[in-house]
Amino acid sequence: MNHPADIPNALDLLRTVFGHPAFRGAQAEIVGHVAAGGDALVLMPTGGGKSLCYQLPALLRSGTALVVSPLIALMQDQVAALRQLGVRAALLNSTLSAEQAREVERALRQGERDLLYVAPERLMMPRMLDLLEGLIAPPIDLRGEPVVE
């Protein structure tokens, strides 16, 4: 385990937020490494627990984690599931009305979201780039490494 100091907090969140009694396989090592700011390429089968390897570190670190996902349905499912658990997650994609998108942007600027899911093509839009640029400056910290789901 690379970062044992992070693991007790991670294990507590794993149990209290996600409802899992223990990590599976290499999850503990990956979560500790990512929570400490490290990069990871995680290859696991469907249902193997990949999402937890970035969702949990997002809750351990300050700022907002950016999750890049090409599948709108996956974004919607993950954000809905995280919200059910009390996690401050949001998405920005073409399914939102202009008013809904503005509300997500406002919440991001106020530091009220832990995870933001976006489609890759949204990262090419000037409005999104301006939003992200504004989040990088203090007081809101947008974590530097996006996650691709």
Language model regions located:
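Conserved nucleic-acid-binding Ia/Ib motif block in the N-terminal RecA-like helicase ATPase lobe
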Residues: L11, T64-V67, I72-M125
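ASCE RecA-like P-loop NTPase motor cores
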Residues: N2-I7, G32, Q84, R113, ...
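SF2 helicase catalytic motif II
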Residues: D114, E121-M124, M128-E149
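Conserved pre-motif I regulatory segment
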Residues: N2-P45
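Conserved coil-to-alpha-helix start sites within the AMP-binding
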Residues: G48-C53, R61, I72-D77
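Short, high-confidence coil segments that cap the C-terminus of an alpha-helix
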Residues: G37-A40, S62, E112-R113
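Short hydrophobic/charged patches on amphipathic alpha-helices used for structural packing
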Residues: V31, Q55, R102-E105, L129
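Walker A/P-loop
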Residues: G37-L56, L66-S69
